[in-house]
Design a protein with these regions (language model features):
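N-terminal (or domain-start) structured segment
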Residues: 25-118, 157-159, 181-208, 300, ...
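An extracytoplasmic/periplasmic, membrane-proximal ligand-sensing/linker region
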Residues: 33-35, 180-182, 245, 267-329
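Short, low-complexity disordered leader/linker segments with a strong preference
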Residues: 1-33, 145, 329
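Hinge/capping helix and adjacent helix->loop/strand transition within the periplasmic-binding protein
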Residues: 86-92, 99, 107-194, 243, ...
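Short beta-strand/turn micro-motifs at beta-sheet edges
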Residues: 26-28, 119-123, 244-250
Length: 329
């Protein structure tokens, strides 16, 4: 269980679900009565896209209305997040996203078109999991220590990919750089799938990205996994060490995926979405599908508890970005 999962699980145990208590006795609104849109800020093939399609399918089954996933990739997830922030707060437009557009980009990018804290309403987390550090299969480095040595000897010649500025892969690599005192060139893509394709084609040296995005290429031999970013080895890759084991003590980095509504969305609608997601996350079908992607269920917190977590994450990343001098390059 990673830091995110522990935090959310503890919050869920310590507090009764606030949103439910707020609306006890209230009448559930006639919602939805038409198609609901779920926006994703990254292309198909990303881990967040898998989570979105799974959640959308289950919501559609429960609600009896179409729930469609729209991929609006670009700007590190900001395009989709901005569209949701500016959408009518009627419950028919939601965002399923990874952390970047919510807790990172505001501290990294100038002239953000939306305020993630004021303009977006946290509803619930869905899943979380570790990342994999992988390299193209012909890179001379066979382990993390050799990769660090190669990066120092290459003097800015190695490049790493991400799914966009401020994305989880971007921040994971920047943290790696900071903790190992190496320099590498950042190559941002619209999504991790494009970067993985370039690694397989030997045009990109390395990525630190989600297990759903990389496992196919790792298993197929197109890329080589050097480490996982969790504190414990992952059962899907038992022979791959953690970055702690590989010589970077204290390195831990995971990704979470969560749902957000526009600010000022009715508490009744927020509660309905929250309860629907909690129900689906308890089913064996959903748990099995998430486990098959090597991610964990992470949806125990109420909207208020999850909102508190988001604010803390935002403050922590602002400090990391400032301390490390990370730039939007």
């Amino acid at each position: 269980m990673n830091r995110f999962t522990k935090t959310i699980a503890l919050a869920g145990l310590l507090n009764a679900t606030l949103s439910i208590s707020m609306v006890q006795g209230a009448t559930t609104p006639e919602f939805p009565t038409r198609t609901v849109r779920m926006l994703v800020g990254f292309p198909p093939g990303a881990g967040v896209d898998f989570a979105a399609r799974l959640v959308a399918q289950k919501l559609q089954e429960e609600w009896g209305q179409a729930v469609i996933v729209e991929n609006r990739a670009g700007a590190g997830g900001n395009i989709a997040a901005d569209a949701v922030a500016k959408a009518a707060p009627d419950g028919y437009t939601m965002l399923l996203t990874s952390p970047g557009p919510i807790v990172v980009n505001q501290s990294l990018m100038a002239n953000m078109p939306y305020d993630p804290i004021k303009d977006l309403l946290p509803v619930t987390s869905v899943a979380s999991g570790p990342n994999i550090l992988a390299v193209r299969n012909d890179l001379p480095a066979k382990n993390v220590k050799e990769l660090i040595a190669l990066a120092k000897a290459s003097k800015d010649q190695l490049n790493y990919g991400s799914s966009g500025m401020g994305s989880t892969p971007h921040m994971a690599a920047e943290l790696f750089k900071m903790m190992t005192n190496v320099e590498m060139v950042h190559v941002p893509y619209k999504g991790s799938a494009e970067g993985v394709t370039d690694m397989i084609a030997r045009r990109l040296d390395l990525m630190i990205t989600t297990m759903p995005a990389l496992m196919g290429a790792v298993k197929g031999g197109g890329v080589r996994a050097l480490a996982v970013t969790s504190l414990k080895r992952n059962p899907a890759l038992p022979d791959v060490p953690t970055l702690n084991e590989a010589g970077i003590p204290g390195y831990e980095f995971g990704v979470w995926w969560a749902l957000f509504y526009p600010a000022n969305t009715s508490a009744l609608i927020v509660d309905k979405l929250h309860r629907s997601v909690q129900n689906m996350l308890r089913t064996e079908d959903v748990r099995a599908k998430l486990a098959a992607q090597n991610v964990e269920v992470a949806g125990n917190a109420s909207p208020r508890e999850f909102s508190d977590f988001v604010r803390k994450e935002s403050a922590q990343w602002a400090k990391v970005i400032q301390t490390a001098g990370i730039k939007a390059n």
